[in-house]
From Swiss-Prot:
Ca(2+) binds at D162, E263, T264, N266, D293. Residues 1-32 form the signal peptide. This is Isoamylase. It comes from the Bacteria. The gene is iam. The active site is at D410, E458. Disulfide bonds join C419-C423. It holds the Pfam family CBM_48. The record marks D533 as: Transition state stabilizer. Keywords: Calcium, Disulfide bond, Glycosidase, Hydrolase, Metal-binding, Signal. It catalyses: Hydrolysis of (1->6)-alpha-D-glucosidic branch linkages in glycogen, amylopectin and their beta-limit dextrins. GO terms for molecular function: isoamylase activity; metal ion binding.
Length: 777
């Protein structure tokens, strides 16, 4: 398990340790084309008919309930669906004239399903809130049908509201078990909304190669919730986020990666805006994989979130910025067994579980319990063809209809599971797993750019063989946790953790050991120092330990990683800022794709809280006012990004060569010891060596700089570096030095204003724990 894997603690759920023998699982049948079953509620082209289609192989009866209003009123129609035994799809088509004239629905059509099955057979005498027909909460086949629970359509394009809101605060109505199974959830349950086709433009998608991206990870609500430049009513919304496209483009960001925006349980955050009770800010508990989260919309009318999302995407596209979204297909918002129960009977039935539990969830070998590699209730059954259909269909919808350019997959190792029930086994060579199906049906963007999706994995989960940094199949980029750890250890744990120069060199050059053995490239390494789950960049260098038990608004937060590889630089604030500059510079000068977290450009702090999943507050909202020091760091970040974008030698399509490939007597990449000699294997492997430099031949990449030189002093004292040959007739010029004496608005020199340092054999003295960047000209 990755020592920095997300620690997500949720009330009402628990991690159930299952130690069952591995069970061989049959391969899935051949999968269908994208959206082949046309599931969901869909109007025909003339909007004369509305068809409802839902999958369940185990249900014995399915009914659709139609509503005029999202909550607080009874259904206006209850209609049985018919099953196609060949596809296991239940369907019903209604003329829109009937919906209007017979059922009196003149506005949006809200709907939900109720399902019966072997553990609760249909009985015509059943009424809402009754036990008529009940046999058991779960049977030996894993069925958990309960007609008292109105179920959200897994393919709904929008949903009415979350299950729990200010007016529907009783979460027990969704539960099974003796105390709750007869409670009817219809008045409060989330309902699907039938939407007609929408023509809102998403603009022209950028087609840049992944290697050229600079990724900015941010929460769509947190981006503007605290921004006075955005109209008050638009703060924290898609519409508000659209207003920041120009600012992010000016920073140099090329791709914005939003934390989950698929509908999640977060309406409860508004019940008590100054409390963490029941709050879910990050959004990693997905209720529906097609619907943009309604809470983030300024326009909350039916269809409003979809239109507003698309308009926001267009704003980013118009600014040349790709839009990525963080997706959570390893588990769902239904969670697992209720805390404090026997783990068998009491579960939430919101959608998937009540329609076809064994199809949508990986279960224990006796089908009674969830199999959990996620820590939040149980694995989504990513090896089942129907569950895979939903993954691929929803991804295609976000890509094609909603304009998304790429996806970051949370705990993506679960999508490499090669079995369904009673076991977990990551197998990248299993052609039928979800990872390989996604690549086959949603082709990744070509290496040189063009049409396609950028696919990024968080390559770990919990337990088993789920830690897979470097282990994903072709087509997948990965969050490189080993890059993060190497930098943190070297910067913050000198004398405690061993990181050799060879390890650093491998990470700085694109991690050939991880991605070069299977045909992948340096740009399949998504490099990062911090992410949303953990310390901010500022806090990584300002705190020795997490500070999660703070009063509102910066806490309290449970969980959180204890092994952070952080250090407060001896409490010296100037050294903390220097460390942040150095870490950011190493990130921007490494081969691979850099990712920063929203606010790190201005030294945003969470005051040491490293698990702010439950804080819908100023702890997570970006602040846009700047002190002089914050403004300096933002300028520093902006200029570093600009330098990276201006120099293709830093963004190689292939791993660097140690040879001279263009005949100018300079190797494409050469590593140096501080004394100017070439670093050899003995130096690379020396645990007591803490300084390293490298030179890239820019001419081999068509770079405007004939050579680029980077020196990193990871030692606790000053070190002199002897500069190498800059090329015939060239001298070295300083772009930046992260030393404390160079802090300020011009810490990174603008093109043409670099400082002359000298030629070959010039000696340059470097402060402890600092970085030097030179170009030859």
């Amino acid at each position: 398990m990755d020592p920095h894997a997300p620690q997500r603690q949720r009330s009402g759920q628990r991690l159930r340790a299952l130690a069952l023998a591995a069970l061989a699982c049959a391969l899935s049948p051949a999968h269908a084309a994208i959206d082949a079953q046309q599931l969901g509620a869909r109007y025909d082209a003339a909007q004369a008919n509305l068809a409802f289609r839902v999958y369940s192989s185990r249900a014995t009866r399915v009914e659709v309930f139609l509503y005029k209003n999202p909550t607080g009123s009874q259904e206006v129609a209850r209609l049985a669906l018919s099953k196609d035994p060949a596809t296991q799809v239940w369907s019903l088509s209604l003329p829109t004239s009937t919906i209007k004239n017979t059922y009196g629905i003149t506005g949006a059509v809200y709907y939900g399903y109720r399902a019966w099955g072997p553990n609760w057979p249909y009985d015509a005498a059943w009424t809402k809130g009754s036990a008529t027909g009940f046999v058991s909460d779960v049977d030996n086949a894993g069925n958990r049908f309960n007609p008292n629970k109105l179920l959200l359509d897994p393919y709904a394009r929008e949903i009415s509201q979350d299950p729990n809101t200010a007016t529907c605060a009783d979460g027990t109505i969704y539960a099974t078990g003796a105390a709750h199974r007869n409670k009817d959830s219809g008045l409060c349950a989330s309902k699907g909304i039938a939407l007609a086709a929408d023509a809102t433009s998403v603009g022209s998608k950028p087609t840049r190669a992944l290697k050229d991206e600079v990724i900015y990870e941010v929460h769509v609500r947190g981006l503007t919730r605290n921004d006075d430049s955005v109209p008050a009513a638009e703060r924290g919304t898609y519409k508000g986020a659209a207003r920041k496209a120009a600012a992010l483009a000016a920073l140099g960001v090329t791709a914005v990666e939003f934390l989950p925006v698929q509908e999640t349980q977060n309406d409860q955050n508004d019940v008590d805006p100054n409390s963490t009770a029941g709050d879910n800010y990050w959004g990693y508990m997905t209720l529906n994989y097609f619907a943009p989260d309604r809470r983030y919309a300024y326009d909350k009318s039916a269809g409003g979130p979809t239109r507003e999302w698309k308009a926001m995407v267009k704003a980013f596209h118009d600014a040349g910025i790709k839009v990525y979204i963080d997706v959570v297909y390893n588990h769902t918002g239904e969670g697992g067994p209720w805390s404090g129960t026997d783990g068998l009977s009491v579960y939430n039935l919101l959608s998937f579980r009540g329609l076809d539990n064994p199809a949508y969830y990986s279960l224990s070998s006796d089908y009674k319990y969830p199999w959990d590699n996620t820590g939040v209730g149980g694995n989504y059954n990513t090896r089942h063809p129907i569950a895979q259909n939903l993954i691929v269909d929803s991804l295609a919808y976000w890509r094609d209809a909603l304009g998304v350019d790429g996806f970051r997959f949370d705990l993506a190792s679960v999508l490499g599971n090669s079995c369904q029930h009673g076991c977990f086994n990551f197998d990248k060579n299993d052609s039928g797993n979800a990872l390989n199906r996604i690549v086959a049906e949603l082709p990744p963007r070509p290496a040189a750019g063009g049409a396609g999706a950028d696919l990024i994995a968080e390559p770990w989960a919990i337990g088993g063989n789920s830690y897979q940094v470097g282990g994903f199949p072709a087509g997948w980029a990965e969050w490189n946790g080993l890059y993060r750890d190497a930098l943190r250890k070297k910067q913050n744990k000198l004398g405690v953790e061993t990181v050799t120069p060879g390890t650093l060199a491998t990470r700085f050059a694109g991690s050939n050991d991880l991605y070069g053995d299977d045909g992948r490239k340096p740009w399949h390494s998504i490099n990062f120092v911090v992410a949303h789950d953990g310390f901010t960049l500022n806090d990584l260098y300002a705190y020795n330990d997490k500070q999660n038990n703070q009063p509102w608004p910066y806490g309290p937060s449970d969980g959180g990683e204890d092994h952070n590889l952080s250090w407060n630089q001896g409490g010296i604030v100037a050294e903390q800022r220097k460390a942040a500059r150095t870490g950011l510079a190493l990130l921007m000068l490494s081969a691979g794709v850099p990712m920063i977290t929203g606010g790190d450009e201005a030294l945003r702090t969470q005051f040491g809280n490293n698990n702010t999943y439950n804080l819908d507050s100023a702890a997570n909202w970006l602040y846009w006012s700047r002190s002089a020091l914050e403004a300096d760091h933002e300028t520093y970040t902006k200029r570093l990004i600009a330098f990276r974008k201006a120099h293709p030698a830093l963004r190689p399509a292939n791993f660097y060569s140690a040879s001279d490939t263009n005949g100018n007597v300079m190797e494409q990449l050469r590593w140096f010891k501080p004394d100017g000699a070439q670093a050899d294997s003995a130096y690379f492997n020396g645990a007591d060596n803490h300084a390293l430099a490298w030179r890239i031949d820019g001419s081999e990449f068509g770079d405007s700089a004939s050579a680029i030189y980077v020196a990193y002093n990871g030692w606790s004292g000053a070190v002199d570096f002897k500069l190498p040959w800059p090329g015939t007739g060239k001298q070295w010029y300083r772009v930046t030095d992260t030393a404390t004496w160079n802090e300020g608005p011009n810490a990174v020199a603008l093109p043409g204003s670099e400082t002359l340092i000298g030629g070959e054999n010039t000696v340059y003295g470097m402060q402890a724990r600092s970085l030097l960047l030179l170009i030859a000209k």
